[in-house]
Amino acid sequence: MAGAKEIRSKIASVQNTQKITKAMEMVAASKMRKSQDRMAASRPYAETMRKVIGHLAHGNLEYKHPYLEDRDVKRVGYLVVSTDRGLCGGLNINLFKKLLAEMKTWTDKGVQCDLAMIGSKGVSFFNSVGGNVVAQVTGMGDNPSLSELIGPVKVMLQAYDEGRLDKLYIVSNKFINTMSQVPTISQLLPLPASDDDDLKHKSWDYLYEPDPKALLDTLLRRYVESQVYQGVVENLASEQAARMVAMKAATDNGGSLIKELQLVYNKARQASITQELTEIVSGAAAV
């Protein structure tokens, strides 16, 4: 059994770590609330854009944009949203496992996969497993802006425009609540069919000014940008929630470990006292 002094040192070490994890839990809780506000502010725009694009996809269009037409799939692209920092439980690895499973489905069919990474954890992971990372952006912090995301989005859209990609997906964690974040893979291009029954049973005719091509080019790009930005802010809220939960679990585990060490310390101290008493009694008997 370890000595009392060694056990006291371990208890002090765990207590210091517990203070750090408790502080990180409180910081993550504060950041999560701000991230939720940012996510809630951006959702109406993203959802409205999705509805408008859904109307266009089911409308009687004068001009059929390439983003609305299916192609034979030879290469697919993924915009992958991960975190820049760790200590957020299984948030990243669960997302990566889901993506790897889908990529395997494509590669088994002879389809190649390109990756545009948002977040340093995704960059390091997919570089280590041999993924084809064609673009990346890292270090966006807790307040990401659309201008920081334009690089990877532009690379993937250009590849799609030039026919080097036949499908484009966004991969991110969807924020459900504090305890639940779901890894999701959503198709961006070509525009997926809507599940809205109203859209399926109605058609819209549009008049375009100045011309449908210019309008659709701009509108569809804004749609992709809005969905990517929404994915980033949802992933950020998921990150802070996962970190808060992970740090709370670490703090609670620290408390349990301290109780166990305290019990071991008490036993060691009791054994030491018993030994001293035995030695005193033995010494007195010898006299």
From Swiss-Prot:
GO terms for cellular component: membrane; plasma membrane; proton-transporting ATP synthase complex. It is a peripheral membrane protein. Pfam families: ATP-synt (PF00231). Coiled coil: none annotated. Its main location: membrane. It is found in: Cell inner membrane. GO terms for molecular function: ATP binding; proton-transporting ATP synthase activity, rotational mechanism; proton-transporting ATPase activity, rotational mechanism. Keywords: ATP synthesis, Cell inner membrane, Cell membrane, CF(1), Hydrogen ion transport, Ion transport, Membrane, Transport. One of its GO terms (biological process) is proton motive force-driven plasma membrane ATP synthesis. The keyword Ribonucleoprotein does not apply. It comes from the Bacteria. Belongs to the ATPase gamma chain family. Produces ATP from ADP in the presence of a proton gradient across the membrane. The gamma chain is believed to be important in regulating ATPase activity and the flow of protons through the CF(0) complex. F-type ATPases have 2 components, CF(1) - the catalytic core - and CF(0) - the membrane proton channel. CF(1) has five subunits: alpha(3), beta(3), gamma(1), delta(1), epsilon(1). CF(0) has three main subunits: a, b and c. This is ATP synthase gamma chain. It comes from Escherichia coli (strain K12). The lineage of its organism: Bacteria, Pseudomonadati, Pseudomonadota, Gammaproteobacteria, Enterobacterales. The gene is atpG.
